[in-house]
Amino acid sequence: MSSDEEKYSLPVVQNDSSPGSSVSSNLQEEYEELLRYAIVTPNIEPGASQSSHPKGELVPDVRISTIHDILHSQESSPVLSPRKASHPVMDFFSSHLLADSSSPATNSSHTDAHEILVGDFLVSDENLQKMENVLDLWSSGLKTNIISELSKWRLNFIDWHRMEMRKEKEKHAAHLKQLCNQISDLKELQKTFEISIGRKDEVISSLSHAIGKQKEKIELMRTFFHWRIGHVRARQDVYEGKLADQYYQRTLLKKVWKGWRSVVQKQWKDVVERACQARAEEVCVQISNDYEAKVAMLSGALENAKAEIQRMQHEKEHFEDSMKKAFMRGVCALNLEAMTIFQNRNDTGVDSTNNKKEEYGPGVQGKEHSAHLDPSAPPMPLPVASPLLPSPPAAVGGASATAVPSAASMTSTRAASASSAHVPVSVLGAGSAATAASEEMYVPRVVTSAQQKAGRTITARITGRCDFASKNRISSGLAIMGVSPPMSSVVVEKHHPVTVQTIPQATAAKYPRTIHPESSTSASRSLGTRSAHTPSLTSVQSIKVVD
């Protein structure tokens, strides 16, 4: 590094030293010109010396002025000259020497201009002395300037050299430190490589030792297996001989056993067949006796059941007849009582209904459904224009099941002679205490007659009671055959007539909805079938009232 920098720095110093030689040559030329101008003695004519004397007096002043201008130009040139300070070596030449080198050119130009004038006059001793003094001053100033510049250049060069040496030392120290770090890293790497090589050597030695042991083991196993194979083959030969002997003996035993079995099997088969046949005959006789006893017992029970069924059917018919008679008596009594009660109000009812009919006209029938289905109506029996209603899912007795078809047939026969008006039934509800305490259902009926006058209604409550306590023993058997317990009694209660009646109710009572016989018979059939299959106490009847 340092040698390369010296190679690059030496040519610069040599190039800078070249202006020194040019400066010295310029100074020498300037001295020669000054000496030439000072020594030259011009040829002066004697006649013209006096006339030109006053001019000669003026010449030294001109020379002196020119010399002073030269000195001033020399002194001012270091300040005005451009500096090219780029290197410490160039400071000396750029400050004063280059300025001094430029001054002779200017002086030469001035001297050339005044060469003719100066050459025409004589140089006196005083002028020479002044010239000498000026030259001494100039030379001494030049000397001091050169020495000072050289000393400055020397000091600058020393400082620059020190700085360069310091930089080189720092670079050298950093490079040396880097090399030391690399050496330490290489040493550590060498140690790790040595350790790894040692481990590899150990692994190689252990593997070679293990391989040797494995080879020895393989040789031992080979010899052992060869011996074992020979031993197994010898044992196999012995075992095969034993198996052959055993097989031969077993075949002989099988032949002997087959001969003995063929002889013994015939006798044993006959004995077993006789024993099995005797046992089967005994079992068959015992089973036939048991089944005959069971058939006789079941046939007796069947005869008893048939007799019981016939007896209960006779009882059922008897109770149905009595129920029909009692029901018809109660209905007739209710009709007579109602007719006598409402006989006084016939005229008033007819007038009121006629007036309402004229006011509403044919729109009254459209209001029937609203009056029938109005839930805000007071709890009084409302006539509902509907076909024959089937009973709700409640218990219906045997007597009530027969009463419904009779009422339906009575309605159909009366409809042919009368106005064919069907009596609607409105179910208001039953008491909760009656359903919890005893098995009684109360179904109030609203009965209207098509042949009666308007405003005549009959309200009746029919209650049916059945006594299940005496029939608990046979209730389960009778339920299977579809026979319901008989009704014990029918109670017909009388109620006070309803005097408060709305206009739609009165209109519905006067003009009830007609029903075809087919729908009434189908409804009665469905009601009869349902009451026959469900053990219910509640029944819905359609009653036709005759005047």
From Swiss-Prot:
Keyword terms: Acetylation, Cell cycle, Coiled coil, Cytoplasm, Cytoskeleton, Phosphoprotein, Repeat
Modified residues (N6-acetyllysine): 510
Cited InterPro entries: POC5
Bias (Basic and acidic residues) ranges: 354-372
Keyword Cytoplasm assigned: yes
PTM entry text: Hyperphosphorylated during recruitment to procentrioles in G2/M phase.
Coiled-coil annotated spans: 163-189, 288-327
Location of region: Disordered: 1-27, 347-383, 509-547
Compositional bias (Polar residues): 517-547
Keyword Iron-sulfur: no
GO CC field: centriole; centrosome; cytoplasm; photoreceptor connecting cilium
Chain positions with Phosphoserine modification: 81, 536
Gene Ontology BP, a term: centriole elongation
Protein localization: Cytoplasm, Cytoskeleton, Microtubule organizing center, Centrosome; Cytoplasm, Cytoskeleton, Microtubule organizing center, Centrosome, Centriole
Superkingdom to which the source organism belongs: Eukaryota
Centrin-binding (CBR) repeats: 114-145, 203-234, 235-267
Family under the similarity heading: Belongs to the POC5 family.
Described function: Essential for the assembly of the distal half of centrioles, required for centriole elongation. Acts as a negative regulator of centriole elongation.
Complexes and interactors: Interacts with CETN2 and CETN3. Forms a microtubule-associated complex with POC1B, CETN2 and FAM161A. Interacts with CCDC15.
PANTHER family on file: CENTROSOMAL PROTEIN POC5 (PTHR28618:SF1)
Protein name from the UniProt record: Centrosomal protein POC5
Organism annotation: Macaca fascicularis (Crab-eating macaque)
Gene: POC5
